[in-house]
């Protein structure tokens, strides 16, 4: 089963995947889709508030944040990692629960990136916002670092995220029943 959608002027067929026995989601993956990544970054930047740095979470937000930073001429964007790396110093972390991840995860931020965010306007970016848990974790990292969240952006808003007045997104992504019909 697939869900056909148009985003940033491009049509894509998204596979419908089970989360559990009663809930299915459309799998939206920008990895490897340069045309879609470039188009979505352009559309989001046209709607973005003024910011100093973009932050995203590993992994699916990386190509989007990279392309947004490239198109905007930003020298750097900030990445919250799923695990600490040997080269990271003064690390701090927050816990996250996501609809696309089976178990609890942590996000880690390097102290050098945290120092860059202090007192700066930070734009939080991800590919899809659904439950908002990943977004909350990114916000907690920004706040812990002393940054000011100036906006929240995603390519797609799924489920309840579609009703968030604080979220800027390109398209709505419905949730699905096991038979592939859209949940009401």
Q: Which residue stretches match the model-derived regions?
A:
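PRPP-dependent phosphoribosyltransferase catalytic core
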Residues: 2-4, 136-184
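Short, glycine/charge-rich flexible loops or terminal/linker lids adjacent to PRPP-binding catalytic cores
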Residues: 77-122
């Amino acid at each position: 089963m697939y869900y056909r959608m148009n985003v940033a002027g491009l049509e894509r067929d998204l596979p419908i995947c089970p989360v559990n026995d009663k809930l299915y989601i459309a799998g939206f993956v920008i990895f490897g889709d340069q045309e879609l990544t470039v188009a979505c970054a352009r559309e989001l930047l046209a709607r973005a508030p003024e910011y100093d740095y973009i932050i995203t979470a590993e992994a699916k937000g990386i190509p989007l944040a990279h392309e947004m930073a490239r198109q905007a001429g930003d020298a750097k964007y900030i990445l919250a990692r799923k695990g600490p790396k040997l080269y990271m110093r003064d690390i701090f972390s927050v816990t996250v629960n996501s609809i696309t991840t089976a178990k609890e995860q942590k996000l880690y931020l390097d102290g050098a990136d945290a120092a860059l965010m202090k007192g700066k306007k930070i734009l939080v970016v991800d590919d899809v916002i659904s439950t908002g848990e990943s977004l909350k974790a990114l916000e907690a990292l920004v706040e812990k670092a002393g940054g000011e969240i100036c906006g929240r952006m995603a390519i797609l808003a799924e489920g309840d995220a579609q009703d968030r007045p604080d979220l800027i997104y390109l398209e709505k992504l419905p949730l699905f029943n096991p038979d592939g019909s859209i949940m009401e």
